[in-house]
Design a protein with these regions (language model features):
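Short, flexible active-site loops
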Residues: 14, 22
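Glycine-rich hexapeptide-repeat left-handed beta-helix
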Residues: 1-4, 18-19, 26-127
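Glycine/small-residue-rich loop that forms an oxyanion/phosphate-binding "nest" at active or ligand-binding sites
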Residues: 5-13
């Protein structure tokens, strides 16, 4: 028992890369978590921060506001520019819009399922 909350909190305009693992951590608004990253228990990523792909944030580590971190374990790389912090929410919105465009490509039965349903309806077949 660590005394840390067992929940993971992700706030608005956050981009989490594919295959990332988030364990009882907090990600404040407008952050980017690179793909294949791991955030351990009690870690905190503050507003306007970026964690590079493949990074590992140890338990209890805090990534301060406006910083870029990378590596295993994650270490400070540099401070983000004002322009970079302005682009973070724009990226989140763009990815969300793109996901809506491709939503039907990831059905559990593939898109063939939709074609079969249309054909069954056209032929009057009920199952």
């Amino acid at each position: 028992m660590s005394g840390l909350p067992a929940e993971t909190s992700i706030e608005r305009y956050v981009t989490v890369g594919a295959y990332s693992l988030l364990r009882s951590c907090t990600i404040e608004p407008e952050c980017i978590i690179g793909q294949h990253s791991i955030l351990m228990e009690g870690s905190l990523v503050e507003t306007h921060s970026i964690l590079e792909a493949g990074s590992v944030v140890p338990p209890g580590r805090r990534i301060p506001t406006g910083e870029l971190w990378a590596g295993n374990p994650a270490r400070f790389v540099r401070t983000l520019t004002h322009e970079e912090t302005l682009e973070i929410p724009k990226l989140a919105v763009a990815i969300n819009d793109l996901s809506k465009t491709h939503f039907f490509e990831f059905l559990p039965y593939s898109t063939v399922y939709l074609e079969v349903e249309k054909l069954k309806k056209k032929l009057g077949i009920s199952v």
